[in-house]
Amino acid sequence: MEIQQTHRKINRPLVSLALVGALVSITPQQSHAAFFTTVIIPAIVGGIATGTAVGTVSGLLSWGLKQAEEANKTPDKPDKVWRIQAGKGFNEFPNKEYDLYRSLLSSKIDGGWDWGNAARHYWVKGGQQNKLEVDMKDAVGTYTLSGLRNFTGGDLDVNMQKATLRLGQFNGNSFTSYKDSADRTTRVDFNAKNISIDNFVEINNRVGSGAGRKASSTVLTLQASEGITSDKNAEISLYDGATLNLASSSVKLMGNVWMGRLQYVGAYLAPSYSTINTSKVTGEVNFNHLTVGDKNAAQAGIIANKKTNIGTLDLWQSAGLNIIAPPEGGYKDKPNNTPSQSGAKNDKNESAKNDKQESSQNNSNTQVINPPNSAQKTEVQPTQVIDGPFAGGKDTVVNINRINTNADGTIRVGGFKASLTTNAAHLHIGKGGVNLSNQASGRSLIVENLTGNITVDGPLRVNNQVGGYALAGSSANFEFKAGTDTKNGTATFNNDISLGRFVNLKVDAHTANFKGIDTGNGGFNTLDFSGVTDKVNINKLITASTNVAVKNFNINELIVKTNGISVGEYTHFSEDIGSQSRINTVRLETGTRSLFSGGVKFKGGEKLVIDEFYYSPWNYFDARNIKNVEITNKLAFGPQGSPWGTSKLMFNNLTLGQNAVMDYSQFSNLTIQGDFINNQGTINYLVRGGKVATLSVGNAAAMMFNNDIDSATGFYKPLIKINSAQDLIKNTEHVLLKAKIIGYGNVSTGTNGISNVNLEEQFKERLALYNNNNRMDTCVVRNTDDIKACGMAIGDQSMVNNPDNYKYLIGKAWKNIGISKTANGSKISVYYLGNSTPTENGGNTTNLPTNTTSNARSANNALAQNAPFAQPSATPNLVAINQHDFGTIESVFELANRSKDIDTLYANSGAQGRDLLQTLLIDSHDAGYARKMIDATSANEITKQLNTATTTLNNIASLEHKTSGLQTLSLSNAMILNSRLVNLSRRHTNHIDSFAKRLQALKDQKFASLESAAEVLYQFAPKYEKPTNVWANAIGGTSLNNGSNASLYGTSAGVDAYLNGQVEAIVGGFGSYGYSSFNNRANSLNSGANNTNFGVYSRIFANQHEFDFEAQGALGSDQSSLNFKSALLQDLNQSYHYLAYSAATRASYGYDFAFFRNALVLKPSVGVSYNHLGSTNFKSNSTNQVALKNGSSSQHLFNASANVEARYYYGDTSYFYMNAGVLQEFAHVGSNNAASLNTFKVNAARNPLNTHARVMMGGELKLAKEVFLNLGVVYLHNLISNIGHFASNLGMRYSF
């Protein structure tokens, strides 16, 4: 039987397979049956193939148990066993190469045509129920097996332990099976010294088209004492039901290994499972490229050895790979007296009987063995041991340089999820990192190590971009789980992580370590570390409207960006942060104004420690839900604040740690709703406009100080410093701090209390006023330099210029009686009358001790916790309803004792805002829910959010918004079509210079005999003056609309020609595609649309008169979503889809004025046009009562226009033009159905008659003989709504 020897590479549609994480073994032949151990099989199967969840070792599909049992069962008993023994001639020539099929196999393998599958296939002689054993254990040399395609069984066992096997030298091999009532498994076993795979190998593929019988299961075993390798072009494909066993000292597969290939076209929904077993490889296993899945939810498993290396791992969007590492000590071999071993011996003995009873021997060393006529005996199977999941040994490693997911455009609710699972001690992802291919509806990747650690050295990419963003209306989700079962795994990320918009990261582990995370590239990310049970360590975290779920963390640096996000879009630490959380440095970046502010807020926690805190204008820090926040080093304003910039810092209880410094000014806007403890820190007050800002404490304040003296100045270390105090407004009390209760304590003496006059006086000595760096409330004078400093502080030039006149002050402390201080149980303040002047006998002095540092003390670190002066918060009173009916939003405000907020609501948001709030909180929920929402939100914030929502809803109802993508595409095409008409209107240019150049080129030329000189003139005439053209352009556009972001990009192509018959005319047609996106200022409305535009255009010439005609149509498919982040508006979040369409016709007349030998043409023109715009009705996918609905809309517009165009032609083909004009709408009719939310309706306002001004320009240059480059830009401005539209194009033209 001949088999094909032609070269062939596989190129078939493939399927995905769903796996088993079960170790699958076989019993190939008696000589090495014990090599593939089976004692561990049932335990592994029981531990990892129970349950139904995909993606975890302990929860694989139940099929795993089925396939493992089938592959591990006693091989199917053959009807006949054919045996071939290689003669001694094969033992003599180690350098000789043989064709294994022709030399030994062909006599016992039949072949034929499979009509059902329309392909040829091969089988063991006599049928798939027979077996072929080839004994060539002493053979040497190299044996090739090439072109054994569609081998459908039965079992094939080749023992060539001393020889080299080359699979697929000229053609590939395919080993498969047929599904029949016996459900047989095809087992193919090659045992060689070395095995190299040079072409494709298929395991359990369907024969031919796959339309006939399907495959059952196939086990291919490759054993090599030295090594198994594959060429880079040799692809190994495992189909549904395939198992590949590899046993060697090392395995190195350079070609792609594809697990889960499609067996036939259309098998995308069919279940599919495959397994690779490398547990008997003693060295490293290397996969250069491993692919799992082919357009379906394939699951695959690798029963691994200690070290598995994968270069690139490609996962289909819903595929899963499970890599099972061996336990500590490895897999244990089965004892020799196990039932299965006995069974094997019995089989051998029974075969021996057959040899004696019904054997026939011939000179070809071939023996036919028939089974006995007696009935087959019942076999007793081994006892199955059910075990739980196990951890990989401590030295087990899985290395993957790069993980990549592949996806298509299929949309499914919840998106698709790919997974990688292992139990190795270490899962290491290299410098290649992880790439997640994102499509509409979202894509996710789960990387899980059930019992070990995960390390990622490379970046995280979305659609092959670091910082890449998810498509509109979708999300991209990375998920890493370390030590899921042991609760003791560590996840480490050694590269900076940059996440674009709507890209999320989830990490579950005992400990998680990150180099850096940046979510400030657009915001709306989730960092979910709530599954980390011990500590999350982040070197640098950059956020902007990011949801951070984390507890007990160490963040070296936290940078909070505003990034153009609207008010209310904060970075939200959405989990209780616990009691062990610390941030070394917090930096709030400067916003631009209130509409572009941001910040950070916390859901709750026991304690947060911050070393350094730098805040900036228009950024917010809300830690009111954290019980205690401590600043240990610095709380300071970052970049110098501008007069309009306000920062807001909000705390529950705040502690300023020992030696910490806090800057405070009018820009700080610090709120402390609970207690404030200054534990030997310093508060720096900045004077602005002659005033200081008052630090207000909601409950109690404690001022803890010590007796330490600064030896350089002689002063006690101050707790409060007022800088530039000389600028304070005189005769005015300046309150520095006020609280319900203020207590004072001296930690050096261990005394503290409330209303303790002695402690209050001690504190006043630590309240210092400075003029520059010189203290002005008290002067400690030790020498003449101190006299000068005192003079500069109080503004006394005499002391500065003549310090000797004031030597009587040396050795004394002088008190400036122009400054009085108050420190009592409710406030701390200063009163500035103006500076007094020291006199020799004026008093107000105190003698200094001989050694000014003798009274210094070492302050202890006692904190004033549970201060005796703390008081509980008052409980607010409830006010009965007496003005409004129950069930209205007004009644809820009144019940909350916020009646004034009703007026604020109507004043700032109007009746429409009130109705929307009624719909969201009461009509869709109840009064209790409404009370909960308004209690959590101020009146100003409610009106801001309502105004944002109504603006967004008005956008949704607007037909102008729905067709904006089509209008931008039409504007782009108008620019391109005008350029084409300018190009083909070169009617007046006489090409004098060009023609002269051509005549000059003919000088001294000699030609063969021609019928006429016309042929010469034609050859050198300008051929490209009026050509037929094919053109294509890349287009882009954007709308400048009050902060909204609307853009379009796409392509346009067409064909046109100049007709020079009885009528001179230009005719052409075009088609274009553009993808448009829209994000409003609040980023609450996101849209993406696919738009098409097509039409025809023409120009007719009559002397210098030009008549233009144009007709076009457009269609757009829009997918939009509402994405409000605030709890108040969360019910509005939903997505919807609609179609937008337009049709337009235009006619215009113009007259050409030619100048400069017809190179310059000026053309005034007038025209009229008609536009029909419309959109279909839609209903959102929301299940809430506020599901958005909108009816269809339609509008007819009639316009008139006037334009002036200048064209300049130079050379033979190049030109430049500029066109400016005005378009006026003079009539419009149509309908606009209201958008509705439950009982709330949004009626789109009818637009006024618009006036547009338009300027466009462009030109073209010749690149090659018949190829031209053109460029154009256009700007359209709506003079009524003040909205601008900009578009540009870059394209090529080919003339023929």
UniProtKB/Swiss-Prot annotation:
- Top-rank taxon, per record: Bacteria
Q: Which residues form a coiled coil?
A: none
Which keywords annotate this record?
Cell outer membrane, Membrane, Periplasm, Secreted, Signal, Toxin, Transmembrane, Transmembrane beta strand, Virulence
Q: Does the keyword Manganese apply?
A: no
What InterPro entries does the record point to? Autotransporte_beta, Autotransporte_beta_dom_sf, OM_autotransptr_brl_dom, Vacuolating_cytotoxin
- Has keyword Signal? yes
Q: Where is the composition biased (Basic and acidic residues)?
A: 345-358
Instruction: Please list which residues make up the signal peptide.
Output: 1-33
Biased segments, Polar residues type: 359-380
Q: Which SUPFAM superfamilies match?
A: Autotransporter
User: GO CC terms for this protein?
Assistant: cell outer membrane; cell surface; extracellular region; periplasmic space
Region Disordered, residue ranges: 326-380
Domain named Autotransporter: residues: 1023-1296
Q: Which GO terms describe its molecular function?
A: toxin activity
Annotated domain remarks: The signal peptide, cleaved at the inner membrane, guides the autotransporter protein to the periplasmic space. Then, insertion of the C-terminal translocator domain in the outer membrane forms a hydrophilic pore for the translocation of the passenger domain to the bacterial cell surface, with subsequent cleavage.
Q: What does this protein do?
A: Induces vacuolation of eukaryotic cells. Causes ulceration and gastric lesions.
Name of the protein described by the UniProt record: Vacuolating cytotoxin autotransporter
Organism from which the protein derives: Helicobacter pylori (Campylobacter pylori)
Encoded by which gene? Answer: vacA
